[in-house]
Amino acid sequence: MSSDSRHKSKFDGRIGLLKIFAGVINPSEKGEIPLTLNVHGTIVSGMMIGMKPYYEQMGKIFVDAIKRSSPETVSVAKKEFKMVFDKIKEPPNPKELEDGEFEFNHIFMRNAKIYNAIQVIPYRGTTYWIGKIESVDGFFLGMIHPLET
């Protein structure tokens, strides 16, 4: 047996299990799972949420950020933003899900904390994060809660 065949597997349980989680949580408006991911050596810990709540919150954050702009800029930005997010925030229809025609490839998180070697980013506040399932090297159910110093 060559060394290549020993290290390659057609089934990647890590990816398969995360896709199952995504298939349950992403179309949900209320479902969530505490999750910690290793993404190329960086730890990301937070609450996995559905795509619709994720995009709704991103929209609110964006609108709040542009409120200080001119009314014309705000109006155009809101219209364009709404058009884009209306298309992407809605999960696939139940028939597509039943027939297995739709595959979820991303994880959406709320209260995400990113851990590097020396600090937690962000230190405070609510952060929304999105990442590709294929980029995940490992994970566990549950969140890391940083110690207060």
Regions found by a protein language model. Give the residues of each.
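Conserved RNA-binding domains used in RNP assembly and mRNA/RNA metabolism
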Residues: 2-149
